[in-house]
């Protein structure tokens, strides 16, 4: 009786609490005429876990037909200026990926704490030495067949939890990082004739991103060396600062994993990652999105995209974007959350008109979602690809689209669904 009365109250007041699984919520609008950021791709890092990356593994991560179709790889530069992941990078390049790299710490003897861990600062007398070493790394990588798209000056430059820290770190202020880029790293790359751009600041999260980005972009010389403005996504709310928007620099999200998974390699953690990808793309306007590691190392062995030789649901869910939202696509305007528990992002390929929609359903029930596509070439139909408790990025039928661009899709409980348009006149 109490439940019945509650449902009557919710019905009368228009609240969604007793909506049935088969009942559609608000219509999601996709406006092809309103374009946002270009997409460079999706990637991860092989550091400390899979430095050589076997051929089958490279295919799982980078093959667009049989794998999840990533298009970026982030390498670690060790304090001695080498990367143990160069063999993995060669396999990524062979599959069409862009490769870039980041250091976690300069050599201990070049820091004021004489330790690669536990923060510390790069000594002024070794700034040029470190910049030259990073530029040499980029040149050597290119000579080995791995053109270096970008070099980061420092992983998480302002992240200073209480020591002791068990990983490599080095501390910069926004001003000191800008000066290192402007006076040392940028000129060192240019001196070698490299097209390699600086990818910075790579802060630990959106919470600390603005100050570093503002320092880099407020100095015209430093800004001239910088390519993507980068951040990790461990803290804060994704957003696009006005100075970054005005600058025209792409925004890259360069590291995220669910660190609070409690050994959960299943759908619960995977949907957290899906929500983060959506928010970074839609609210943060990122052009590139990186998971932390392909295969996680201790102590977070369960937080990777792959455990053992199997992709986790987390890995397949990244593939709901990375396999279909290809480099060169552009995000277009869409209703980001058309009803409770549903997230939507939309992307188009300007040369072909292909449209890709990615919908996240975090609810415990199936949801019907109406979609209206306006202001562009309407697709005839969409193929449907689902990752859920039972499906691993598997095709699940198709949906016809009306002449007015309207259709309804069923989103399985706790799932990510990708809709890939079939172009007018195409056979499939």
Residue spans of the language-model regions?
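Noncatalytic carbohydrate-binding groove/subsite architecture in carbohydrate-active enzymes
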Residues: 127, 167-274, 283
């Amino acid at each position: 009786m109490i439940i019945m009365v509650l449902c009557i109250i919710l019905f009368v007041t228009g609240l969604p609490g007793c909506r049935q699984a088969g009942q559609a919520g608000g219509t999601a609008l996709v406006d092809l005429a309103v374009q946002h950021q270009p997409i460079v791709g999706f990637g991860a890092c092989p550091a400390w876990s899979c430095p050589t990356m076997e051929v089958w593994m490279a295919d799982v991560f980078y093959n667009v037909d049989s794998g999840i179709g990533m298009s970026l790889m982030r390498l670690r530069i060790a304090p001695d200026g080498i990367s143990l992941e160069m063999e993995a990078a060669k396999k990524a390049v062979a599959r069409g990926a862009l490769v870039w790299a980041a250091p976690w710490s300069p050599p201990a003897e070049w820091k004021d704490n004489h330790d690669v861990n536990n923060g510390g600062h790069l000594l002024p007398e070794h700034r040029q030495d470190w910049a030259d070493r990073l530029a040499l790394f980029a040149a050597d990588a290119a000579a080995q067949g791995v053109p270096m798209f970008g070099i980061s000056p420092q992983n998480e430059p302002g992240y200073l939890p209480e020591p002791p820290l068990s990983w490599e770190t080095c501390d910069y202020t926004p001003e000191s990082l800008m000066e290192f880029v402007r006076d040392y790293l940028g000129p060192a790359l240019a001196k070698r004739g490299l097209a390699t751009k600086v990818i910075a600041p790579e802060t630990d999260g959106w919470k600390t991103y603005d100050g570093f980005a503002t320092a880099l972009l407020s100095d015209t010389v430093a800004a001239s060396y910088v390519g993507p403005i980068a951040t990790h996504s461990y803290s804060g709310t994704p957003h696009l600062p006005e100075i970054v928007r005005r600058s025209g620099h792409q925004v890259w999200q360069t590291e995220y994993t669910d660190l609070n998974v409690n050994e959960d390699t299943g759908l619960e953690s995977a949907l957290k990652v899906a929500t983060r990808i959506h928010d970074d793309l839609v609210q943060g306007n990122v052009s590139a999105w990186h998971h932390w590691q392909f295969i996680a190392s201790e102590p977070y062995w369960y937080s990777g995209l792959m455990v053992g030789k199997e992709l986790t649901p987390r890995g397949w869910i990244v593939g709901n974007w990375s396999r279909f939202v290809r480099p060169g696509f552009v995000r277009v305007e869409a209703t980001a959350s058309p009803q409770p528990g549903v997230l939507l992002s939309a992307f188009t390929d300007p040369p072909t008109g292909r449209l890709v929609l990615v919908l996240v359903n975090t609810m415990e029930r199936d949801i019907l979602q109406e979609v209206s596509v306006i202001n562009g070439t309407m697709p005839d139909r969409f193929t449907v690809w689902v990752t859920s408790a039972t499906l691993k990025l598997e095709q699940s039928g198709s949906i016809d689209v009306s002449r007015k661009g309207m259709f309804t899709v069923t989103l399985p409980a706790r799932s990510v669904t990708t809709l890939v348009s079939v172009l007018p006149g195409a056979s499939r």
